Structures are given as structure tokens and as C-alpha cells.
């Protein structure tokens, strides 16, 4: 999931280390066990930017393919990313926190600056999400259902009721 954070006409991005070098990305990451997509987005935004973030809308669901060439210790990789992008309200900077491992810095870019830096983006979804946001695309968070089995750590057999 990814947080598309706009404030006063600029977008909050992170500059992060990747196997392809330093890249720009939206605050984004993966699900941890027991959390919903919205909770994961809030957590990732905080870990990567040190800002509180409150998702108000689902911006969209995106897929992109990435091919990483072979390296000395790894074969070619063909990776498909599935991104749930959320937009919402920027909260306060949490003084005393540090940026997540691999994040070099945060930066605010205007739409034109973001477009001009496309070669440095981690994926084409960075630009696509911004353009969709600027077009006013929004979906209600109620579109996403998180079943209670996600939060309940007890094992559930197929066919059991939670």
C-alpha cells in the first residue's frame, strides 16, 4: 500500500536505497500480520516520513511489472507489484522518531518537479498515483472489507466461522 500525501500543492516523497540505486517513492510498504490495508498505510507513512497520516479515501488499486536484471548472486527477477494507494490528511511530524531503514530523506515536490524526476521513480506508479489524485479520483474506504480473521490470531480451518 502507498500513502499519496499532498499538502499545499506539493507531494511528500521518500528517497530510498534500492538495488537500482537511490530512488524516489511514495511512502509505501507491505502488510504486517494482523493489520488492515488502512492500518498498514498509516504505519508505513509514519515509519518512512515520521508524519502521522490519516487515510480518507482509496485513490486506486494499481499493478505494475518490474524486471530486475541478474546480478552476481541472483538470477533475473520478474516482479509484479500490487498497490493499494490511499490519500488523506497529513498529521504532525513526530519529533524524536527516525526514518525507517533504507530511507535517506523525505522531500516535498510540486507536480512539475515530480513529473521531471520520473527517471528516478521507483516505479511508474509514483507518477500515475499523483496524476489520478490531481484528477480528483477518490473512492470511499468502505470499498475495502477487512474480515475479523485478519485481526484474530487464532488459526481458522476452512469452513469455520470466525
Describe each PLM feature range.
Residues 58-61:
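Residue-level recognition of beta-strand microenvironments
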Residues 19-21:
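Short, surface-exposed beta-strand-loop junctions and turns on beta-sheet-rich folds
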Residues 31-54, 64-125, 156-161:
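Unchanged
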Residues 1, 53-56:
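Small-residue-enriched segments and motifs
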Residues 129-162:
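Charged phosphate-binding loop/patch that engages nucleotide di/tri-phosphates or the phosphate backbone
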Residues 24-27:
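A short gly/proline-enriched turn/hairpin at secondary-structure junctions
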Residues 16:
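Short loop/turn segments immediately following the C-termini of beta-strands
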Residues 1-12:
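Conserved N-terminal beta-strand and adjoining loop/helix that marks the start
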